[in-house]
Amino acid sequence: MAKKSLIEREKKRQKLEQKYHLIRRSPKKQISKAQSLSEKWELHGKLQSLPRNSAPTRLRRRCFSTGRPRGNCRDFGLSGHILREMVHEGLLPGATRSSW
């Protein structure tokens, strides 16, 4: 189980990312279209003035039940060992154990 402070920090980052998503998107598009170097520097300055935690690269996908940051399955939002336990218990509809 992850510390609650880490989980709350991640939630705060998600809120910031959603809040600044549109604001961050427009300068990034303009940077790719900018022709002069001075324009690019100016647009980079605008991006750097935004909060650091509003960047989508700072988000980390965590397990829904335990908060574990590694070994997550995107389809279910669970880490590998929790996913395995829930499939064995039949708690995930449509998920079956593999056998060949």
From Swiss-Prot:
<comment type="subunit">
    <text>Part of the 30S ribosomal subunit.</text>
</comment>
<keyword id="KW-0934">Plastid</keyword>
<keyword id="KW-0687">Ribonucleoprotein</keyword>
<dbReference type="GO" id="GO:0019843">
    <property type="term" value="F:rRNA binding"/>
</dbReference>
<keyword id="KW-0694">RNA-binding</keyword>
<dbReference type="Pfam" id="PF00253">
    <property type="entry name" value="Ribosomal_S14"/>
</dbReference>
<comment type="similarity">
    <text>Belongs to the universal ribosomal protein uS14 family.</text>
</comment>
<dbReference type="GO" id="GO:0015935">
    <property type="term" value="C:small ribosomal subunit"/>
</dbReference>
<dbReference type="InterPro" id="IPR001209">
    <property type="entry name" value="Ribosomal_uS14"/>
</dbReference>
<comment type="function">
    <text>Binds 16S rRNA, required for the assembly of 30S particles.</text>
</comment>
<dbReference type="GO" id="GO:0006412">
    <property type="term" value="P:translation"/>
</dbReference>
<dbReference type="InterPro" id="IPR018271">
    <property type="entry name" value="Ribosomal_uS14_CS"/>
</dbReference>
<dbReference type="GO" id="GO:0009507">
    <property type="term" value="C:chloroplast"/>
</dbReference>
<keyword id="KW-0699">rRNA-binding</keyword>
<dbReference type="InterPro" id="IPR023036">
    <property type="entry name" value="Ribosomal_uS14_bac/plastid"/>
</dbReference>
<protein>
    <recommendedName>
        <fullName>Small ribosomal subunit protein uS14c</fullName>
    </recommendedName>
</protein>
<keyword id="KW-0689">Ribosomal protein</keyword>
<dbReference type="GO" id="GO:0003735">
    <property type="term" value="F:structural constituent of ribosome"/>
</dbReference>
<keyword id="KW-0150">Chloroplast</keyword>
